[in-house]
């Protein structure tokens, strides 16, 4: 027995076949310029084949805001995932402190890339008795800066 296939059913199947590839997870890329919820700006260069990258960071927040300088960062990410985890270190050029960030690069439901991070900042102290107050902990959410084309 042969059944006639409805043109509507064929149209539905064709539509699904064309739309389904676009529903797959979009890859999140660290490379580019980002700003965070505090107004800091980070630029990440190309990620090499080993997952390593470098860049710069200019913070919007500091104990002495008049001394803020562009500071280098160095990091690594897992390359295989569409939404990779990563970590990087910032060597602050204007203070005796270092920060480390860990996070994950996500593509949200609206298609925008977001870096969700947690950080530790180690301040230099003159005496071991001050060690208890030398490490700060926090979080930042970074979003990709708009480009001229957007």
From Swiss-Prot:
Modifications made to the protein after synthesis: Glycosylated.
Source organism, top-level taxon: Eukaryota
Subcellular location: Secreted
GO cellular component terms, A-Z: extracellular region
GO-annotated molecular function: biotin binding
Matching SUPFAM superfamilies: Avidin/streptavidin
Gene3D superfamilies for the chain: Avidin-like (2.40.128.30)
Keyword Disulfide bond in annotation: yes
Signal peptide bounds: 1-24
Pfam families associated with the record: Avidin
UniProt keyword terms in alphabetical order: Biotin, Disulfide bond, Glycoprotein, Secreted, Signal
Domain Avidin-like stretches: 26-147
Cysteine pairs bridged by disulfides in the record: 28-105
InterPro entries per UniProt: Avidin, Avidin-like_CS, Avidin-like_sf, Avidin/str, Avidin/Streptavidin-rel
Glycosylated residues (UniProt): 54, 93, 141
Residues bound to biotin: 36, 40, 57, 59, 63, 95, 99, 140
Subunit architecture: Homotetramer.
Protein function: Forms a strong non-covalent specific complex with biotin.
Family stated for the protein in its record: Belongs to the avidin/streptavidin family.
Protein name (Swiss-Prot/TrEMBL): Avidin-related protein 6
